[in-house]
Design a protein with these regions (language model features):
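Thiamine diphosphate
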Residues: 46-134, 281, 290, 295-299, 324-326, 332-334, 338-342, ...
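Structural signature of the thiamine diphosphate
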Residues: 2-5, 38-39, 80-91, 95-117, ...
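Aromatic-enriched
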Residues: 2-13, 184-211, 355
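Active-site diphosphate/adenylate-binding microenvironment
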Residues: 25-29, 33-35, 43-56, 365-451
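Phosphate/pyrophosphate-binding active-site segments
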Residues: 2-19, 154-157, 218, 310-407, ...
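Glycine-rich, anion-gripping cofactor-binding loops and their flanking helix/strand elements
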Residues: 60, 80, 232-317, 420-451, ...
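Glycine-rich, acidic loop regions that bind phosphate or pyrophosphate groups
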Residues: 2-7, 119-161, 259-363
Length: 568
């Protein structure tokens, strides 16, 4: 069982915790609780003490990370694992700024979060430099590139409505983190505002335009070679059921992006799985006469590094208007993916055995042939160790276990080859920052238990990315969080090594001195083991059967499959 910090649970009847005087911090806690929040991530700080004092009088569970960036990753993981809003408390200045890389990932991937950052007292705000601790010229401006919106709350009575509005914005598509900041004195000063009794936040409706759905149906009804790219928006919009129905009506091959991994059944006869970076898949998608793109910008990875040159028409569905037609012209439908696909599915009336032919080949046979080509290409590249390593991990992981992947060679393989089954695949593919996997997994495990569905999760990192979040071993131990952390240690930044050797013939500044990860984990009180690559499956199974956190270290040098956008 996860152990939350002492002093953050409700006091027994007749007893009090913290001070007896209500303040602005109480309004924050009360509003969050009324909105359904149960857990908060963050680190205490001087200007934020009013928040933490108030938590002592409320029911919010608090998970304290060791670095604010990891707190942001944890709140992100909490949201991805549960579908709920992640909540993050930050202190002023350095604390707030340290969170920004984590927030960039949430913003890029569309993860709903409410961020409450403290501020210096009101009297210090503005153009004057009063020399207050942690003072920034404009703190919320620093968050502008990584959050949907930013707001300064200047009086206590405005706190409940501001948080309610932020929650609504966070869950409205396109989803993402919303930034609020509250000055120290507004959090600490006594208030006359009564306790918050209720709060309601509902996502704004984001349906597709009727005429655009009608036009898309017209295109698809006459298409001979329809195909579908399912991006991350498919999962965020919970559109999996509609996607399956549409694909089967059209007999359209479906490929998932890294963010869309799991949106379509891996073993379905129309599934091209997630081999989005393979040239055989790029060729197939280019040959589609109508291509449906859901929740994807057709960006760098999805377009096979901008080599994708579609010859047919594109129907692009996305809640973010800036994404539509940003890389390829088409029929742009600005809408939530769930609502758009439901409308398209309802309007698309076609027999299940609708005639479809890709130049004389049935779509189902084309899928088999394409996957066979991918398999043959991989088998021609001396990648037996890598293929077995990923297969052994997949075999060891229970079908319903959620996994969190850092930016590491194993994750890049996972983007293409990981069958999520009944679990979920989460990675830092949005912004691509290092250090995501372990703290996000911590947040995910906390979320599952908090919502009454406890379960172990897996984090996967390289030795380079592991050092970004190594301090969170203390967090995992303190809260007894059921996370198994697989660290694949190749002695450096493995993917950078490959990139540099490929581009320049040699690698520079990619080799790393690193600790003995087993001894380091044990120093935190976390059980750890080091195994050979061929034993990774058994080691993971043992870790999954244990209680609390544990670490599995594998020292091995993995290679990536050859890129195909360069003609390979």
């Amino acid at each position: 069982m996860i152990e939350f910090d002492p002093g953050t649970a409700a006091a027994p009847a007749g007893e009090s915790k913290g001070t007896s005087q209500r303040n602005g911090g109480d309004l924050v806690v009360e509003t969050l609780e009324a909105l359904g929040a149960k857990t908060v991530f963050g680190i205490p700080g001087q200007h934020a003490l009013g928040l933490f004092d108030a938590m002592g009088r409320g029911n919010l569970h608090f998970v304290s990370s060791r670095v604010e960036n990891n707190s942001a990753f944890a709140a992100d993981g909490y949201s991805r694992a549960t579908g709920e809003v992640g909540v993050l408390f930050l202190s002023t200045g350095p604390g707030a700024l340290t969170s920004l890389a984590g927030l960039q990932e949430a913003y890029a991937t569309g993860v709903p979060m409410v961020v409450v950052a403290s501020q210096i007292p009101l009297e210090g705000l503005g153009a004057r430099r009063k020399g207050m601790l942690h003072q920034l010229d404009d703190q919320k401006a620093s968050a502008a590139n990584v959050t949907k919106s930013q707001r300064l709350i200047q009086h206590a009575s405005g706190i409940p409505s501001a948080i309610q509005d932020a929650w609504t914005e966070a869950i409205s598509s396109p989803q993402g983190p919303v930034w609020l900041e509250i000055p120290q004195n507004v959090l600490l000063d006594p208030i006359m505002v009564p306790p918050v009794e209720d709060a309601l936040a509902e996502a704004a409706d984001n349906p597709p335009r009727v005429e655009l759905v009608r036009e898309a149906v017209k295109w698809l009804s006459t298409a001979e070679r329809p195909a579908i790219i399912a991006g991350g928006g498919t999962r965020r919009g919970r559109a999996e059921k509609s996607l399956l129905s549409i694909a089967e009506k059209l007999r359209a091959p479906v490929i998932c992006t890294p963010g869309g991994n799991g949106a379509f059944p891996w073993t379905h006869e129309l599934s091209l799985q997630s081999w989005i970076e393979d040239r055989h898949m790029t060729d197939l998608l280019e040959d589609a006469d109508v291509l449906i793109v859901i929740g994807s910008s057709l960006g760098e990875v999805t377009s096979n590094y901008f080599t994708f040159a579609p010859r047919g028409r594109i129907v692009q569905i996305d809640a973010e208007p800036r994404v539509l037609e940003s890389n390829s012209p088409g029929l742009g439908i600005r809408a939530d993916a769930g609502q758009a696909l439901a409308a398209l599915d309802e309007a698309l009336v076609m027999p299940v055995d609708a005639a479809r032919s890709w130049h004389g080949t049935a779509p189902e046979d084309l899928v088999k042939e394409s996957l066979a080509k991918v398999k043959a290409r991989l088998e021609s590249q001396d990648l037996g160790k890598e293929l077995k390593f990923m297969s052994d991990i997949r075999d060891a992981v229970p079908a319903d276990m959620q996994t969190f992947w850092d930016m590491t060679i194993s994750a890049y393989w996972g983007w293409s080859c990981w069958d999520a089954r009944q679990g979920q695949f989460h990675s830092a593919q949005g912004a691509g920052g290092l250090g995501y996997g372990f703290p996000a997994a911590i947040g995910g495990a906390v979320g599952l238990e908090t919502l009454g569905n406890p379960g172990r999760v897996l984090a996967v990192s390289g030795d380079g990315s592991a050092m970004y979040s190594i301090s969170e071993l203390a967090t995992a131990k303190q809260h007894n969080i059921p996370v198994t952390w697989l660290i694949v240690d190749d002695g450096g930044y493995g993917i950078m090594r490959e990139y540099m050797v490929g581009a320049f013939g040699k690698a520079t500044a990619t080799e790393l001195a690193r600790p003995d990860f087993v001894k380091l984990a044990e120093a935190f009180g976390v059980p750890a083991t080091r195994v050979a690559p061929e034993d990774v499956g058994d080691a993971l199974k043992a870790g999954f059967a244990a209680h609390g956190p544990n670490v599995v270290v594998v020292e091995t040098l993995l290679k990536m499959f050859a890129p195909t956008h360069l003609g390979g």
